[in-house]
Amino acid sequence: MVKNIKRYRKDLERENSPLAEKDELGRYVNMDIIPQTYIFPGDYNIFVEEFRRQPNATWIMKPSHRAQGQGIFLVTKLTQLKRWQNESKVPFSNNQGYKESYVCSKYLEEPLLVGGRKFDLRIYVLVTSFRPLKVYLYDLGFARFCVEKYSNDTNERENMFIHLTNVAIAKQNAQYNDKHGGKWTIQNLKFYLEQTQGKGAAEKCFDEINNIIWVSLKAVQGVVINDKHCFEMYGFDVLIDANLKPWLIEVNASPSLSTTTEIDR
């Protein structure tokens, strides 16, 4: 998805599309939907150059083909990556013999908090056709909250209970509440944002989320095999930052449909 979004932006630029408009800092106005992201091992050397340009940034590493928060960790120093390379025997510096690919994204260190906790949105999307693109959004998605209050302290970088919203992670914590599962419906979250941020700001935020979903699917429209007898269902994970800007974090091709609380049913 990341590579296709980047390619789609370049295609729009070549077409002089207004969707590819940039601001005075060179950032996309309408297509700035994903954090700065690299795919390892292929992008490792490029990432090292960028890391040295932003030595104080935090990055989040995720294995491409795992689920439930497994294998995710934060990186603030190159030595962490090099040590991890040696321990896991994954030679990023070349494409020989690595076990699995990883996605490395710039960590959004200032998320919007509710009750001091970080959260993200899980939105279910049904695509019945890619050509033409026909998309349906399920109204009853939900917000998932971290089980512990958020802290940007460097000493808390390894505490996944404040950084990850995955239920499988949260259940390992004694504070996990199995009645509500640390979840709100999206309708409840939107109502909360209307009350705390204003109705106009909340509506703008959710309009931008809809745009993220549409742009993401347009980006892969040309590479997904279209079969009128089939459909695709995706789980979009979106994080809202402190400025009420939504960011695409993940697109899950096989989202879990298991239920743990009434909100899921």
Task: Explain the meaning of each model-derived region.
Residues 1-60, 65-67, 74-87:
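Conserved N-proximal alpha/beta basic substrate-recognition cap immediately N-terminal to
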Residues 18-31, 227-236, 265:
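Short amphipathic alpha-helical segments embedded in low-complexity Lys/Glu-rich regions
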Residues 46, 50-233, 242-247, 252:
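Catalytic core of tubulin tyrosine ligase-like
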Residues 62, 262-263:
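Short, solvent-exposed loop/turn segments at secondary-structure boundaries
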Residues 75, 264-265:
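Short, conserved loop/turn and helix-capping segments at secondary-structure boundaries
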Residues 206, 263-264:
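Short, charged, low-complexity patches
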Residues 252-260:
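Glycine-rich phosphate/pyrophosphate-binding beta-alpha loops
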